[in-house]
């Protein structure tokens, strides 16, 4: 069992991330990825702690799901707000890792996300957020790693 990790947000243990029922896949949101690949981000240590717990087998996740919209937003944000080096490291990790699973968003899923985006005006969510949620539903993925509150 991994040791607790001290972060600016407090002490983090594997139990902070443990789902209510065991699933082996989880979607990974762009803000989580941005924090993970940007050592200057205030939530970097929290994202790293999660990955440590996954790597050490303390959490059940074996597939970290990303899609075209997640990758685009995370890479662009890393390039513009951190550095091209951080963005390139992120993209190389996706190519080399067996943990990350790339799943393309189908046209039907994207069309549904666009319709919901236009209809639900009371949420402060981006089109990417709606696309990720619709894609998760289509893949039957119950959990997402994100720092957004509107999921």
Describe the residue ranges of each PLM region.
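Short, well-structured N-terminal submotif of metal-dependent ribonuclease cores
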Residues: 1-66, 79-89
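Acidic, metal-associated active-site segment
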Residues: 126-143
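Acidic catalytic patch
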Residues: 98-120
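Helix-adjacent hinge/juxtasegments
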Residues: 75-104
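Short active-site oxyanion
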Residues: 60-63, 99-101, 140-142
